[in-house]
Amino acid sequence: MITVTNARKNYGNFAALDDVTIEIPSGELTALLGPSGSGKSTLLRSIAGLEALDDGVVVIAGKDVTRVAPQKRDIGFVFQHYAAFKHMTVRDNVAFGLKIRKRPKAEITKRVDELLGIVGLDGFQHRYPAQLSGGQRQRMALARALAVDPQVLLLDEPFGALDAKVRADLRTWLRRLHEEVHVTTVLVTHDQEEALDVADRIAVMNKGRIEQVGTPEDVYDRPANEFVMSFLGDVARLNGHLVRPHDIRVGRDPSMALAAHEGTAESAGVTRATVERVVHLGFEVRVELRNAATGDLFSAQVTRGDAEALRLTDGETVYARATRIPELPTQ
C-alpha cells in the first residue's frame, strides 16, 4: 500500500499539492485523473521521490520514504517520453537494471525472456529502439521498469504521445498486463476514457486537491460534485439538473419524450427545444439542441437506430427529457 498524508508542495505562490491525503491499495491500478495543473504529476513525482514535499508524509509498504532517495524506494517509473538507450538492443535495455544490480547472468536471461514474452516483444529482442514503433517502445519501457521486480510501478501519461488508435490498444494491453503481474500501479492521465478503462480506482484531482476517490463506476455514476461529473464526461444542464447526454431522450412530442414514463410533460420535466445540428459519430449520433425557454445550448446522444427512426432535421421543434438524473451532494 502507498499512503500519502497531508502532502503540500508549493512553487512560489502556486499550490501544486494542497493538503493531499490518499491511500493506494496494494496490487491495484489507481489512476490520478485531472486537468493540466491539477497536481497529479506532482503527486506521482512526490511518491517517486523526484519532488521533495514541503510538508507531508509518503509511506510505501509500511516504510516512511518521505526523505528516502528515489533509487532506494523500490519503484519502477515510466515517463511519457521514454529515454531508451539507443545503442542497446531491446534485450539489453530490459536487462539494464538487473545488470546494474549485478544479478546472476542466468537470472537475468530468465527474467528478460519472461518479460519480453509478457509484453509481446519476444520476437523483437535484437532490434534497437529506433526500429520499434511508439507503442512497442513503451512496452519495452514497461518491461524495463518491471525487470527489477519493483514494489510500485509509476506511470506518468505513458501513452500520451501516441495516436488515438495505438493508445486504445495499449490501454487494453496494460489492463491485461496488470492482471498478470499485480504490481501496485499508479497511472497519471488526463484522459477520462483511459482512466475509466484501465483503473481499479480513480482519484480525481483539481487545483492541488483530491475531489473524489472511488471505482470507475462510483466516480462516473455517483460523482461527488459538479466538477467531477463534468470532468468525467460531457454534461448537459436540463431543467436545473446536470445530466449525461446519453441520458436524454428526444422525441417530436412530449409523450414520445416521456416514452414509458408516466405523468404529464410538466411533471416529468420535458423541455421544448430546437434542433441546431445533427452530428453522426459512428455508432452514435449527437443532437445539438437549443432550449426554447432559455436559449441555452445542450446536446443529447442517441443511437443510430433512434436517429434513423426520428430523422431529425435542423430547425425543427422536439422535446427532450432526462431519463436519469445523478444525485449530486448538496454543495
From Swiss-Prot:
Q: Does the keyword Cytoplasm apply?
A: no
What subcellular locations does the record give? Cell membrane
Cellular compartments per GO CC: ATP-binding cassette (ABC) transporter complex
**InterPro entries, alphabetized:** AAA+_ATPase, ABC_SmlMolc_Importer, ABC_transporter-like_ATP-bd, ABC_transporter-like_CS, Mo/tungstate-bd_C_term_dom, P-loop_NTPase, Sulph_transpt1, TOBE-like
Keyword Transcription recorded = no
Q: Which CDD domains match?
A: ABC_CysA_sulfate_importer
Query: Which SUPFAM superfamilies does the record cross-reference, listed alphabetically?
Result: MOP-like, P-loop containing nucleoside triphosphate hydrolases
According to the record, the signal peptide region is none
EC number(s) for this protein? 7.3.2.3
Which residues does the record give as ATP binding sites? 34-41
User: Which keywords does this chain's UniProt record carry?
Assistant: ATP-binding, Cell membrane, Membrane, Nucleotide-binding, Sulfate transport, Translocase, Transport
Q: Which reaction does it catalyse?
A: sulfate(out) + ATP + H2O = sulfate(in) + ADP + phosphate + H(+); thiosulfate(out) + ATP + H2O = thiosulfate(in) + ADP + phosphate + H(+)
How the protein sits in the membrane?
Answer: Peripheral membrane protein
Sequence ranges assigned to domain ABC transporter in this UniProt record = 2-232
The broad enzyme category this protein falls into is translocase
Q: What does this protein do?
A: Part of the ABC transporter complex CysAWTP involved in sulfate/thiosulfate import. Responsible for energy coupling to the transport system.
The entry assigns this protein to a family as follows: Belongs to the ABC transporter superfamily. Sulfate/tungstate importer (TC 3.A.1.6) family.
Q: Mind telling me which NCBIfam families this protein's record contains?
A: 3a0106s01
- Name under which the protein is recorded: Sulfate/thiosulfate import ATP-binding protein CysA
Question: What is the source species?
Answer: Nocardia farcinica (strain IFM 10152)
